[in-house]
A protein has these predicted regions:
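Extracellular/virion structural assembly segments
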Residues: 1-211
Length: 211
């Protein structure tokens, strides 16, 4: 799990790719279909890290670069706009999702909660279901009145594999980020030691296609 936060002033470069297959049905009709419901994510991040954190990142890179291994890393973008908190007894988050295809292809993915007090929690996804307005299944003391659904999003109920260790209300949440299984997209790591205890590092990451 890579929890290092990027240099926010440098921005995040983000692109999507939707893989498709071309099928010949031998009747002169060619059709394309999506191989995966989820789009593939390509991301570039710039980090300003302490010596300890920089060494942890470089050690991870050399251990898993290329096809040697995979890791979880949040997108560090607001992919799920939370409309409930997460209760200790019911680890379910209701949110408007900007992730296309999340209802059909959520296996091996996780979500990361960034709280206003600085706490960060990552939990794997156990299930994603359409949210049914008025359903009692997701009501708890940590639900606060729903706003209108944001255009272009899907309102979903995300069941987590475990809770966050305590009740977390919506008001405590700064951001909820999609956290796909990822690998480094390049075998080259750019590291610039600007100080004996500060390194500027750029990495390129891509989400892993489910096969």
């Amino acid at each position: 799990m890579l929890h290092a936060q990027p240099n926010w002033s440098g921005g995040i470069d983000f692109s999507h790719l939707t893989p498709v297959d071309l099928v010949d049905y031998q009747d002169t009709v060619l059709k394309r279909y999506r191989k995966y419901a989820l789009e593939r994510h390509f991301r570039s991040y710039n980090f300003n890290l302490s010596r300890r954190d920089a060494l942890q990142l470089t050690n991870l890179f050399y251990r898993v670069r290329g096809m040697q291994g995979e890791f979880y890393m949040p997108t560090w973008t607001e992919d799920f706009i939370a409309y409930t908190g997460v209760s200790l007894s019911s680890p379910v988050l209701v949110a408007d999702s900007t992730i296309q295809g999340i209802l059909e292809d959520w296996e091996d993915a996780a979500v990361t909660f960034i709280l206003k007090n600085g706490e960060i929690f990552t939990r794997k996804i156990a299930a994603v279901d359409p949210y049914i307005e008025g359903s009692d299944a997701f009501n708890s003391g940590y639900d606060e009145g729903f706003d209108a659904q944001i255009p272009g999003t899907e309102r979903v109920a995300i069941t987590l594999t475990s809770g966050l260790g305590r009740n977390v209300s919506r008001r405590e949440i700064t951001m909820v980020s999609f956290t796909p299984l990822s690998r480094f997209a390049s075998d080259t790591l750019s590291v610039n030691w600007v100080h004996h205890n500060l390194a500027s590092i750029k990495i390129n990451v891509q989400s892993v296609d489910k096969t």
